[in-house]
Amino acid sequence: MIIKNALVYTPDHTFVPGDLAIRDGRIAADTTPQPGEEVIDAGGLYALPGLLDIHFHGAVGHDFCDGTEEAIQALADFEASKGILAICPATMTYSEEILNGVMDAAAAHKNGRGADLVGINMEGPFISPHKLGAQNPAYLHLPDVAMFRRLQKRSGGLIKLVDIAPEEECAFDFIAQCKDEVRISIAHTCTSYDTAIAAFDLGASHMTHLYNAMPGITHREPGPIIAALERKAEVELITDGVHIHPAMVRFTFRTFGDDRVILIADSMMACGLPDGEYSLGGQAVTVKGPRATLTEQPGVIAGSATCLYDCMKRAVLDMGVALESAVRAASENPARSIGVDADYGSLAVGRYGNVILADKALEIQSVIQKGVRIV
């Protein structure tokens, strides 16, 4: 396949008028059309790399923690239709027994149709009881190396991220023992600046949904956010227009840099569906517009109802983030953060030929997966 006359997002994070070639499913250097080769005239559309969401829970009525092939395939199909061509869905805080079923289903899944399943983000249960967000307190568990390793074995090595509250008992031991086995993210935490610094120095390298479910910044208690800034951690941002004020989104891109920000959806099963009553982690959720909240605690946000592509689009059109930065934060950065950037996250030669063609309003005109047009 040849894509002609596009504004191509290059590995240098700039847009350049040009052509793309996809052969044997991967980006090729020679853009000269071969006899009989499919040629698409992009007519000046943006050519963006396929996105990668490393933190979302569900969509279109399904949740990753359903622990079924039906759910995984439904999520893969929906995400791909939105230009998200690789996924690393997140678990919720559940018992090991329930998580076993999720890991078994993920391990059995075969990539083919829809977004590629490239990892699992284990968001619970090693978190603080005081910063639960929409996590279920009934299933909280202290950080447990043996439990993690059992789950990782069942998943076939798919767990790429484990979330942890570093102030909890056993957390430092977990970080020290597991830092070379999985990426460790600080999340759902009451941690102080000093404890967060110590956790990063031990081997944590990531921060889950920055600003949400953690202490804020003050001049006497700088907290984990400043620790993440100083220790060069990668940080997730939910740019759905509900979780974070646009000024804070711009602030984060300026201070952390667009090489360290990772856009995520953190979406739940209502994403792609009308307003109504849903569930997340065994708790009732009410969705109205882009806002999802616990039904019994309307002040508690319960994930988002927005997919990653629309979060990226909103960051650009509504929040003042440069398109080049937002694309990087939704493609290259998440791919690198979970170690799959040799195949995903950019339009460099040798990467999978995953391309989104979008107009100047960032409306998707076509989605191409490994050289096959799927939208």
Show where each model-derived region lies.
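His/Asp/Glu-enriched, well-ordered alpha-helical/loop segment
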Residues: P224-E236, F253-A265, C271-R351, V355-L357
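Alpha-helical scaffold segments that flank or form the walls of functional sites
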Residues: Y46, I54, F64-D116, A138-R154, ...
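Divalent metal-dependent hydrolysis catalytic cores, especially in the metallo-beta-lactamase
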Residues: H57, Q73-V102, A115-S128, S155-E167, ...
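Conserved, mostly hydrophobic/aromatic
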Residues: G44, M122, C178, M207, ...
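Active-site core of metal-dependent hydrolases
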Residues: Q152-P274
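C-terminal cap of metal-dependent C-N hydrolases
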Residues: A6, R336, S346-V375
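Histidine-rich, glycine-flanked metal-binding segment
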Residues: M1-L48
